[in-house]
């Protein structure tokens, strides 16, 4: 009995759905992001959309040092701290774009600790990119532009199994990041 085009399409769709479900289950089982600061920060960023007028960007020095509530009390602003671990200049750029897409920003502060500028791009430190993009909105163009800049097609392949992000490095997988 010949299979119709509709049956073949249904089989392909079922395969894609089962593969996606399997990858989602593996992600759930292998990646513990319950305590991920970046996940919480980005959830709060999206929940606060339209209200932010002052933004703080930078590495851990920023997110551990700036208290938006104290800034708001002193300046009468509605500030947000979008700092994250290992945030490099390109990460700050994409966080600025992500925030500016939904907010009318008046002031942006960029923390510039010197060791953060030993590497200017996340292509040399993939985890710096993944800490942000893993939790950015799935419909955000900034997420995909940042991933493309960091690792090209290889970075998109890594979206399928985030458990790999802990081992992703240019030295460990040289052909992948060229």
What is the predicted function of each stretch?
Residues 1-7:
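N-terminal Lys/Arg-rich, disordered targeting/topogenic segments
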Residues 23-33, 78-86:
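Acidic/glycine-enriched edge-of-secondary-structure segments
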Residues 28-51:
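Alpha-helical transmembrane signal-anchor/signal-peptide segments
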Residues 57, 61-146:
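Membrane-embedded segments
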Residues 125-178:
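Secreted/periplasmic serine-hydrolase-like ester/acetyl group-modifying domain
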């Amino acid at each position: 009995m010949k299979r119709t085009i509709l049956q073949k399409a249904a089989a392909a769709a079922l395969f894609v759905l089962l593969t996606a479900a399997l990858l989602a289950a593996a992600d759930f089982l292998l990646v513990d992001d319950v305590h991920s600061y970046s996940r919480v920060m980005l959830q709060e960023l999206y929940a606060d959309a339209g209200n932010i007028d002052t933004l703080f960007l930078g590495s851990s020095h920023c997110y551990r040092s700036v208290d938006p509530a104290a800034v708001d009390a002193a300046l009468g602003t509605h500030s947000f701290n979008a700092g994250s671990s290992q945030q490099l200049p390109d990460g700050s750029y994409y966080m600025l774009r992500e925030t500016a897409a939904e907010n009318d920003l008046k002031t942006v502060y960029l923390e510039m600790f010197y060791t953060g500028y030993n590497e200017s791009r996340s292509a040399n430190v993939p985890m710096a990119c993944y800490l942000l993009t893993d939790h950015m909105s799935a419909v955000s163009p900034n997420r995909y532009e940042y991933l493309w800049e960091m690792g090209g097609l290889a970075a998109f392949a890594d979206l399928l199994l985030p458990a790999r992000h802990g081992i992703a490095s240019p030295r460990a997988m040289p052909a992948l990041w060229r």
